[in-house]
């Protein structure tokens, strides 16, 4: 049976070791959240009960949890069943590629917590396997592979600062397929059906943020039609996210290198999505400047 309790925000921050949980906790604390670091999974339910207690003066509580320490998924499921109409309970999952995690562990010269007598990659693989269920149940997944601590803190600030009544925070992210598809994307669109400005000498050094490139890309046959049709298709999706209390969405727009077509289309799509009710939009260009 669900228990009716006040609407405090409760954020559970978890994910891969080395993916940036402590950085996220610090960033949330800077935004005014009350942050509990290294909370044992068994303490989650008492924390949520505290958030719902009458007179609680902590409107935003974040718990940084290491899910390796217990049966976290069953604990979370029990919380959702008990407090189904209670706090705005969200799960933020941080992940990174094996290469990024190996690099970070080698920089600090520490073994992975699950490494045992095996290799560093063995420990990462074991942890990733344990994380499958909780990743799938998370409200927001952030891939930190290409982010330093300052960029990750900025990402958290963009996602969790500002008006609390924004129904869905949408990140429109351009990227280059040659650098890999964003692991944290909810939806991916491929702009390689459009002619590449790279092959036009005067446009090659420019980016999709420049008017000449934007006009070129959006002036191609089917470009404007696609962007407007995609925005119309996303409208009921984002409205459904609001009804289901899914408060974050990442829409990835790709081209070959992430410099021209995907950037121009991301900017145009963002401007259209900003007209939707209950939607707060930010635009990121993941691979701009990598060429």
From Swiss-Prot:
Residue positions binding ATP: 15-22
Per UniProt, which keywords does this protein have? Answer: ATP-binding, GTP-binding, Nucleotide-binding
Q: Which domain of life is it from?
A: Bacteria
UniProt binding sites for GTP: 66-69
**Coiled-coil regions, chain positions:** none
InterPro entries named in the record = P-loop_NTPase, RapZ-like, RapZ-like_N, RapZ_C
Q: What does this protein do?
A: Displays ATPase and GTPase activities.
Family named by the database record = Belongs to the RapZ-like family.
- The identity of this protein, by name, is Nucleotide-binding protein CMM_1747
């Amino acid at each position: 049976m669900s228990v009716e309790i006040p609407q405090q925000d409760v954020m559970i921050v978890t994910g891969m070791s080395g993916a940036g949980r402590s950085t996220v906790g610090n960033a949330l604390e800077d935004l005014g959240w009350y942050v509990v670091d290294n909370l044992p999974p068994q303490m989650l339910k008492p924390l949520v009960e505290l958030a719902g207690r009458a007179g609680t003066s902590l409107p935003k509580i974040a718990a940084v949890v290491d899910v390796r320490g217990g049966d976290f998924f069953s604990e979370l499921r029990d919380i959702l069943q008990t407090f189904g109409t209670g706090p705005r309970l969200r799960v933020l999952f941080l992940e990174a590629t094996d290469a990024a995690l190996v690099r970070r562990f080698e920089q600090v010269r520490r073994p992975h917590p699950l490494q045992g007598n095996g290799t560093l990659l063995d420990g990462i693989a074991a942890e990733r396997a344990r994380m499958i269920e909780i990743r799938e149940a998370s409200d927001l997944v952030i891939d930190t592979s290409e982010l330093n601590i300052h960029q990750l803190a900025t990402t958290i600030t963009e996602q969790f600062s500002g008006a609390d009544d924004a129904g869905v925070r949408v990140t429109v992210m351009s990227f280059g397929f040659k650098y890999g598809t964003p692991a944290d994307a909810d939806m991916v669109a491929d702009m390689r059906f459009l002619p590449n400005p790279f092959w036009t000498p005067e446009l090659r050094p420019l980016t999709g943020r420049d008017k000449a490139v934007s006009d070129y890309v959006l002036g191609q046959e089917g470009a404007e039609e696609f962007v407007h049709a995609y925005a119309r298709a996303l409208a009921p999706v984002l409205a459904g996210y609001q009804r289901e209390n899914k408060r974050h969405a990442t829409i990835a727009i790709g081209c070959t290198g992430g410099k021209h077509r995907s950037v121009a289309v991301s900017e145009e799509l963002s401007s259209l999505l900003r007209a939707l009710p209950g939607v707060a939009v930010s635009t990121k260009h993941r691979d701009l400047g990598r060429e």
